[in-house]
Amino acid sequence: KLKRILYPENMLFKMIILNCGLLLLVTLVLTAAGNYIYEESIAERSYANTMEIQNQVLKSLDLIFKSVEDNVEALGNYPEVQEYLKVDAENQQASRVELERQVRDLLLDYSRIYSEYLNIVVVSEKGQYLSNDSYRVKKLPLTEEKWYQDAVLANGELVLSPTSLGRNLKAWKNYSTDNYVSTVKLICDRQTSAGIGVILIDLDLKSIQNLVEDITMGQTGFGYIQDSQGHVLYAPQNEVVYRMNPNWVTDGESGRVRCRIKGKDYNVIYSHSKYTDLTAVGVFDWGKTIEGISRARTVSKWIAVIIMIFAAGA
């Protein structure tokens, strides 16, 4: 029977076998090509839409942190703040006490106006400090803290501190470290431009949370924000996000990568902000995204099997 199919003597039978074979080949090629083109089309459309959403989110984040930077700059330029950062605490005791009162009133005013500023700390290069809502845990100078040193090294640029764990400051209201992101900036003498201290602001994450939660990436995707150190700044409740490798989204200002997590394929799309050094990341369950293509592949396989059975039976 097999020999008869492979080497038929009847011309009509030969034509049937040939036509069935060609039909099978055309079906497989067209189905594979169609699926590939459709899958690439979905990937490109997903990439373009996600990039647009992420760039809008990053622009909004830039505006939020630019506002923080402007407010820090304005606070640092107040005459009483400038004088407080330069005062000699030991030899100018009376002046120091009065300046502390004035600066503390300023900090309270700022915290009332900007309710998202959970904590504001002013630290002089001499080690003295004032805050609206925190106190020093250990009697070690805050100038030795990493966040202070980072601000000095940034030379006047706003720095986002990735974590406040281990910081020598504790808030009276006892905010969780998951509730805010710390920003620090060097304050310079208005006359000499020399650094005279640092201002730290703990920004409530709710403003960022609202932006990220508004990101809609279809039924199979979600978004999150990652800082320059690879720490997740904010993400929705999701077991996948904490299995992401930060190095996957560090190649260039934007891009995409396919990765495998817990046996599933994910399409990862990312975009980076030069101003904040933050990265917006979109993650899609690629298997669910192309379920329609998978069904089409299954149907095409069954069609091929039916054709082969028909050819063999003929």
Regions found by a protein language model. Name each.
Residues L2-E44, A48, V305, I309:
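Extreme N-terminal signal-anchor transmembrane helix of membrane signaling/transducer proteins, especially
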Residues A33, N49, E80, K301, ...:
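Signal-transducing alpha-helical linker
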Residues A48-G156:
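Extracytoplasmic/periplasmic sensory segments of membrane signal-transduction proteins
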Residues Q102-S111, S134, V198-A235, E239-V240:
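Solvent-exposed, extracytoplasmic
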Residues R112-Y114, K126-D202:
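Extracytoplasmic/periplasmic ligand-binding sensor regions of membrane-associated signaling proteins
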Residues L130-L140, L160, V232-T250:
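GAF sensory domains
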Residues V152-C188, T220-F222, R243-T276:
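Membrane-proximal, non-catalytic sensory/regulatory domains of signal-transducing membrane proteins
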Residues T279-A314:
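Cytoplasm-proximal transmembrane signaling helix
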